[in-house]
Amino acid sequence: MACPRVIFLILITFFILQTAFSSSWQTLSGKPPAVIARGGFSGMFPDSSIQAYQLVNITTSPDVMLWCDLQLTKDGVGICFPNLKLDNGSNVIRIDPHYKERFSVDFTWKELSDVKLAQGVVSRPYIFDDVSSILAIEEVAKLTASGLWLNIQDSAFYAKHNLSMRNSVVSLSRRLKVNFISSPGISFLKSMKNSVKPTVTKLIFRFLKQEHIEPFTNQSYGSLAKNLSYIRTFSSGILVPKSYIWPVDSALYLQPHTSLVTDAHKEGLQVFASEFANDFVIAYNYSYDPTAEYLSFIDNGNFSVDGFLSDFPVTPYRAINCFSHVDPKRAKEQAKITIISKNGASGDFPGCTDLAYQRAASDGADILDCNVQMSKDKIPFCMSSFDLINSTNVIETSFRNLSSVVSEINPRRSGIYTFSLTMSQIQTLKPTISNLEKDSGLFRNPRNNKAGKFLTLSEFLFLPNRYSSLLGLLIEVENAAYLVEHQGISVVDAVLDELKRATTQQNKTSARTILIQSTDKSVLMKFKEKNKMNHDELVYRVDDNIRDVADSAIKDIKNFAGSIVISKKSVFPYKGFIILEKETNIASKLKSNGLRVYVERFSNECVTHAFDFYDDPTLEIDSFVRDVQIDGIITDFPATTARYRKNKCYGEFGLTTTGELITFANPMLLPPAEAPYPALLDSDVTEPPLPEARSQPPASSPSKAEEKAIEVPFAFIAMAILVCFFISV
């Protein structure tokens, strides 16, 4: 009996050790990676401002270190400022217009008291400019409990002005809690080696771009990265641009990771990675998700960096504490939120294609959506837009001659509409990936452009057979009145026929939820009448930003729908990317009246979020789920929300405070006030009944698209006749 007991204890011990080993960090110390806030929360407030440093304490924990780019004034006072020149990052040019170049050594500490800080990155909020003064290093030290990281970028510059950066740093390290001192200059680090206690303050060699030359050795930083044993003689760690670890090619795709972290750890060097910011362009592999990028440096199964230098410290802080070491297959869902795709995973693949749906299902979407369009031969299929120009390469084909203006749909621009082509013609087109507005400068995965194929509604209804994790499907029906009145096509009947056929074929679709969504009450009423659909299966979509919903409108909606879709701006109204108030009460009002509330559209790109969410799509999701308590998220990046549902610290951190950033703004820089969004009234919901389709459209009344299609070929025919005539003459 003793032997089995011993074996059992051995197995238990082995299991515990194996679990501990597998869950330990692959950092040099075995502890979680550190987070260093570069100039405070410099992604939001001006770098090195008191607001930037204070926001770090509000959004993270005392463990997060504050970074100070140390500069010296003419009278030797140490200040925190991101650049040698004061021009970029302050309003010094308005204070003293006489200097061509303005450095901190040109001013005494007292003279700098009138200089205010400004945002140095043009894409970031400028409304906080000219509010905060430059801080002395002693003032910054009072704001942190964990200690400071001092960066000395150019000690030789100050030596030319008879100022000793070394002496200043030594003095500061004796008076203040300085955890790390970094510099790209080897001579400076060597001079500091015997002046600080390595158990208290660590010296870190900062790498610049690989082609740049380090002055002491006259070697490139790229070559020095291959001589880590030499680096170990004067430092205890390295700070490298992230591309040293995960290279990115010219097309913005990741290359295989290097062995730098592993090699450095073998030499006893810590590795800190830099150049992280939520509003920087990152490799397409990350789908514009900053948390995914951080996780690739710490949770890849091969190595982990020892820390991050970030302009948005809340994101790496939560990536480390909430999303690392989470097994997506085994982890339980913490957040109760339904994920509905927006044209599939249309952030990664062309929308409404087989590949977009496949990615959405594998990424964790609960419900796949199909925006139903109709072909000329009355076949319903899935496509994100009524206009083929928006979703396909039709403009590159001979079908471009079918361009027409349909005033009922878009009176300002011509289009090539789905009802102008047969299904077989549409299937010859290549799908194109949807991008944000052109002026954003952000493009979605170009390698996936023109990948995949569009699905007919019949094929779409079979997807639950392929992806067993799905809870249901959502079918969106728009432009039904136009199609009936002008094209003689009943999209409602076409959808009902496909639903009946799918049920008859017993393809298991009937066992899953089918939702019908529309912006038109008349469409939803028609489904309710013809198919006896329960109002819980009908979803009413509000296609405008609204600030309130009248009680009479809610009562009307409840008669024909059980769910409602509203925009993000209807919940958190914002202008110039700054939320104007904490939140409206729309969601709670709708929910208290028994309606499920879905919100659209959630994307990963930083330009789609209000600044109050710190350019972090995960923090935005958290606010809508925990604060507003919506029922579902409609997203073109389902993976981001699916990962959020399984985070380890759900509910442990405080909610992101919305509507308060504006109180820190410079009133002179705020945009002018605008009229609030309108309220949704009963008159906005009420519509005349949807007419029945004609049996056949009148032969004498071709559509405008057909007129255009006939007109262009006729011109070619006429030209051919004339050519033949002149040849014969």
From Swiss-Prot:
It holds the Pfam family GDPD. GO terms for biological process: glycerol metabolic process; lipid metabolic process. Residues 1-22 form the signal peptide. Its main location: membrane. Its EC number is 3.1.4.46. It is found in: Membrane. Expressed in stems, flowers and siliques. PANTHER family: GLYCEROPHOSPHODIESTER PHOSPHODIESTERASE GDPDL5, GLYCEROPHOSPHORYL DIESTER PHOSPHODIESTERASE. This is Glycerophosphodiester phosphodiesterase GDPDL5. The lineage of its organism: Eukaryota, Viridiplantae, Streptophyta, Embryophyta, Tracheophyta.
